[in-house]
Amino acid sequence: MTYNLQFNPKALKEWKKLNSTIKEQFKKKLKERLENPRVPKDKLSGFENVYKIKLRTIGYRLAYQVKDEEIVVLVLTVGKRENDIIYKSLK
């Protein structure tokens, strides 16, 4: 089953600021996650149904929530990992 991709407004604003190279890298990974959104090693502890995608070489992160009842992967936040700001924005 393929999930639908949605962005919360804040995440969409950040997404639009990304350069095309970073977007393409995230798109490739998001395409895989729409087929299989629950990757145990990428689950964020302390959050229910929230997972991350890491672009380690450039230090960017994307956090998303899986909503099974709606068959949706909702992007919650996108940004640089610096000082864990991206994770703090989830709280």
Annotated model-derived regions:
Residues 31-55:
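A short, surface-exposed loop/turn module that caps and links secondary-structure elements
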Residues 21-33:
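Compact soluble domain cores
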Residues 23, 35-39, 83:
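Generic structural signal for secondary-structure transition and capping sites
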Residues 2-5, 10-17, 24, 55-61, ...:
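Enriched for short, Lys/Arg-rich terminal
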